[in-house]
A protein has these predicted regions:
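Short amphipathic alpha-helical/adjacent loop interface patches that line ligand
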Residues: 71
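Conserved phosphate/oxyanion-binding catalytic-loop motifs
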Residues: 42
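Asp-based, Mg2+/Mn2+-dependent phosphohydrolase catalytic module
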Residues: 2-6, 14-20, 24, 28-31, ...
């Protein structure tokens, strides 16, 4: 039995708006006893907040253990590969919780790492402080590099815009953990005791969700409900295994 790795923003919902067919698809997986994990690049929410958000949107039987975020993967990646624990963070509660769970401490001076996730309240001063740490030698690590974030039918700036700004200013390329980089997948597979042949990646974004699977030789399903549609496939040269307009197409009697 394969495990679905399911994207959230643009696949399950757009901000506070349900994606048509998403609740029905999750209910179908639950009814059939099919396995799934919500694999999201959105590092802003804790697992508890992510669960509550979906329950508020009308999804049923959602558990905290259903979620694996780029924040969790980033914290695990740094903890596994480095012994230092002092970090300067740009991010929200999801990234803060993930770093604390791996025993990182937050500092304003002499940071070992600058960890950058989406922060919708960050300002020029915060970005400049991050730049100072990077120029002083702190390792620059990004949860994800999404250009856009689906939000109630519109698109907001994604974390990739902030990461690119800091890369340009510092001349230092960030270590990127989230989709489409294999790092997040390798950490998840180890954490969940899965293999590549055990999974199906499902998402709306060719540059992240589908690219991760395409480059990793993993089965993918693209749903045309968010950032991209089938007209973008040839332009981006990223080819999903299957394309659907609506997740209801995946529901089988």
């Amino acid at each position: 039995m394969k495990t679905y790795l399911i994207d959230l923003d643009g696949t399950m919902y757009s901000g506070n708006t349900n994606i048509d067919g998403a609740r029905e698809f999750i209910a179908y997986l639950q009814e059939k006893g099919l396995l799934y994990i919500f694999l999201t690049n959105n590092a802003t929410r804790t697992k508890t907040q992510a669960k509550e958000h979906m329950l508020n949107l009308g999804f049923k039987n959602i558990k905290e253990d259903d979620f694996f975020t780029s924040a969790i993967a980033t914290a695990k990646y740094i903890a596994k590969n480095y012994s230092e624990r002092k970090c300067f963070m740009i991010g929200e509660s999801g990234l803060e919780e993930a770093l604390k769970e791996e025993n990182f401490i937050f500092v304003e001076d002499k940071a070992d790492f600058v960890v950058v996730g989406l922060d919708r309240k960050a300002n020029y001063t915060k970005y400049s402080e991050a730049l100072h740490h990077i120029l002083a030698g702190a390792k620059f690590i990004a949860t994800n590099s999404d250009r856009l974030l689906a939000n109630n039918g519109l698109f907001d700036l994604g974390n990739g815009a902030t990461v690119n700004m800091l890369e340009y200013a510092s001349g230092v390329e960030a270590i990127k953990v989230g989709k489409p980089y294999q790092t997040i997948l390798n950490i998840l597979l180890e954490d969940k005791n899965l293999k590549k042949e055990d999974i199906i990646l499902l998402g709306d974004n060719l540059e992240t969700d589908i690219k991760l699977g395409y480059e990793g030789n993993i089965e993918t399903i693209m749903v045309c409900s968010g950032v991209h549609d089938e007209n973008d496939i040839e332009r981006l040269k990223v080819y999903p295994t299957k394309v659907v307009k609506n997740l209801r197409e995946l529901i089988k009697d």
